[in-house]
């Protein structure tokens, strides 16, 4: 779908479908009044009959109104005379998109300037959410279907904006388009079956991305290099699988050479059986999504590349497959990490933190401004925050605050959890420096505490996306593309873009 921005009168625009908002109690905004006047009161007449109550997201399609160049007019309810919340605004846009997809028109014009959104400016903030909602709603994953989804007739959507705000709306669309591209890439990787999407496949994806972008350098560390670097925890996770582990390093130089980079670390467990600590069989197919941390880093990088942000960014993807076998890691094994700290592996299903801890140590060599790791790390985070909010922890209040703010601006929210010293005690082991689990209580926090022991050399934050990275079961099952909006917004803010 192509999104364009124009500053023209809605009543004079030629299009297959013109979309205008109508409030409750038959209230018409400036745009609706102009269209009503041009159509000789057709809008008012419909509202007087009570055909549309004007509640947010309600729609009514009108055909061939006199005095207009539009073939159809789609009225959409915008509610009472007050600003909408982000969720209501997104639902309104999705409702419009749903109607447009069912029509045979190749284009549509959205004249929604009169709708206010709470805590969003009238141009960039509001239209960024609108554009992301439209573009993300276009996503289809039918790669393995013998019958593909029929191509939609709607190819172009024009957003009408006032002249003063046109440049900001265009900027919003540019950013939204890049984020949507990144989210789609993230969702594609997450939705791929694990027999195809394994560590070596992700390494090939990185190499292809590197070939397409001169500013991006790619290095892939194989299992021998991982072992030679002393990454005993990382190596242990993959040793039970026929698919060898890979540490993928993508280095984007968009800023000045002297600028310290931001580092994103993604957990890339391409399939997680739990290892010897085997998971239950029911729902195990969804463990292909255990690489969504790495997928979201990939997606964020795609957005950054498309926008050519003036920042230096290093992406580290810690990829392995966690399988049981005669060579797999056992509960009770003790490994030495790259940092020199030893870990007693009490549960092989707590493997994400093992690949991450060595990768966090590896990140020190880049002398980063900040390091953010992203992982589908704990089921406890789903219990605590559900599927709406990402868990966030860190050792630097400024960094955590910046990420929380980015989440609000991107409507991709996170919530901070504590890393108090008392939780660290739950990781004590009688045989090693620490265990890899901290007991049944506060599992998300103790996982963060574990990682914090390997991130003391820099400002660090940990994002647990176990609840937000994918939707379980039902017709909407699949990867969500989160937290690409949050991460991209964070980097946009750092770049001043």
Swiss-Prot record:
Q: Which UniProt keywords apply?
A: Aminopeptidase, Cytoplasm, Hydrolase, Manganese, Metal-binding, Protease
Tell me, what is an example of a GO biological process annotation in this record?
proteolysis
Listed NCBIfam families? PRK00913.1-2, PRK00913.1-4, PRK00913.2-4
User: Per the record's keyword annotation, is Hydrolase included, yes or no?
Assistant: yes
User: What is the first-listed, main subcellular location in coarse terms?
Assistant: cytoplasm
* Name the record gives this protein: Cytosol aminopeptidase
Which Pfam family name is an example for this entry?
Answer: Peptidase_M17
Enzyme Commission numbers on file: 3.4.11.1, 3.4.11.10
- Which co-factor is required? Mn(2+)
Q: Which reaction does it catalyse?
A: Release of an N-terminal amino acid, Xaa-|-Yaa-, in which Xaa is preferably Leu, but may be other amino acids including Pro although not Arg or Lys, and Yaa may be Pro. Amino acid amides and methyl esters are also readily hydrolyzed, but rates on arylamides are exceedingly low; Release of an N-terminal amino acid, preferentially leucine, but not glutamic or aspartic acids
